[in-house]
Amino acid sequence: MNDSGNSSKVNVRPPSAGLGAPSPGKRKMLRLEVRNSQVPIERKPSWIRARATIGTEYRKVQERVKKQNLRTVCQEAGCPNIYECWEDREATFLIGGSQCTRRCDFCQIDTGKPAELDLDEPKRVGQSVAQMKLRYATVTGVARDDLPDGGVWLYAETIREIHKQCPGSGVEILIPDFNGKPELLQQIFEAQPEVYAHNIETVPRIFRRIRPAFRYDRSLDVISQGQKAGMITKSNLILGMGETGEEVTQALRDLKSAGCDIVTITQYLRPSPRHLPVARWVKPQEFIEYKEQAKEIGFSGVLAGPLVRSSYRAGKLWAQSVKAKMVEIPERVRKLINEIEMQETSFRQAV
């Protein structure tokens, strides 16, 4: 983040129930959720605190969002990294609705029957990126197993709309697994996002308990298909859900073997009492060690830290990965790469 100009510093404490915990609504709690809720929300350690600088670019983006009545995940989730990402003119958007057809025990998005697909949403997201004058947008969404194509058209069309309305901006797409079907993933590849991301989130031993609708091997294959299609690939690991250090190291090796270029490593923050209790708080020194391991394993981009999220400073991490991999840079984003490289290189929330 650029500290020049009119800026002020604030301490940001993540919300007590995680990043923007949802209301359970009228849905009856599952037995698992009842069991989870018997464990009180854990007190966060002193190092789970974001130190933010409110700079000039952040204020400009904030004014545009307010004036145009735009919506971003950054705001609605109360993300403590918003100050730094917006200062870099980066933001994250959620598509496909507010209800997911799958339930992961760490995830704040509610599970239920989704509304009909909003076919105008891709165009509105593209307009938002243009109005906010973003240079890099991350797009993620809910699983839509209620649809024959899993909602893949919506993801691909959103990439196309952002490229159309903001030809100089980068797009990172964070997808569900679309059941690993090559014909569906091909639609994402053809839309040509700058980064193709799918998060494995945790290790094999506890994967099924935490992500019952996903499969570890299938998630790795989703990443492999992206790598074979020539994508820059990315994934995320959440720590503090019951994994061991050896399992984390092996998961990093699995990701690299699958063709993953970029990895982010973060601390689990419990969204609400009905979610999985925190197994442990990973100390900053451990994140440093995991970061070094990931670099040694061969990832071209690594960010690790308690408040790192998969979309945190995504444009900066992409630019670093492109440079490290020495891949050919498309003409459309060469100017963007140069802009990013000229900026400050530090990541405030990473170790």
UniProtKB/Swiss-Prot annotation:
Pfam families in the record: LIAS_N, Radical_SAM
Record-annotated Radical SAM core domain positions: 86-300
Composition bias, Polar residues: 1-10
Reactions performed catalytically: [[Fe-S] cluster scaffold protein carrying a second [4Fe-4S](2+) cluster] + N(6)-octanoyl-L-lysyl-[protein] + 2 oxidized [2Fe-2S]-[ferredoxin] + 2 S-adenosyl-L-methionine + 4 H(+) = [[Fe-S] cluster scaffold protein] + N(6)-[(R)-dihydrolipoyl]-L-lysyl-[protein] + 4 Fe(3+) + 2 hydrogen sulfide + 2 5'-deoxyadenosine + 2 L-methionine + 2 reduced [2Fe-2S]-[ferredoxin]
UniProt-annotated location(s): Cytoplasm
UniProt: [4Fe-4S] cluster 2 binding residues: 100, 104, 107
Chief site of localization: cytoplasm
Keywords for this protein: 4Fe-4S, Cytoplasm, Iron, Iron-sulfur, Metal-binding, S-adenosyl-L-methionine, Transferase
Cofactor: [4Fe-4S] cluster
GO molecular function, one term: lipoate synthase activity
InterPro entries (UniProt xref): Aldolase_TIM, Elp3/MiaA/NifB-like_rSAM, LIAS_N, Lipoyl_synth, rSAM
Record-listed E.C. numbers: 2.8.1.8
Pathway where this protein functions: Protein modification; protein lipoylation via endogenous pathway; protein N(6)-(lipoyl)lysine from octanoyl-[acyl-carrier-protein]: step 2/2
GO CC annotation: cytoplasm
Renumbered residue ranges of the record's region Disordered: 1-27
Chain sites annotated for binding [4Fe-4S] cluster 1: 74, 79, 85, 311
Cofactor binding description: Binds 2 [4Fe-4S] clusters per subunit. One cluster is coordinated with 3 cysteines and an exchangeable S-adenosyl-L-methionine.
Entry's family note: Belongs to the radical SAM superfamily. Lipoyl synthase family.
Stretches with biased composition (Low complexity): 14-24
Domain of life: Bacteria
Name of the protein: Lipoyl synthase
This protein's encoding gene: lipA
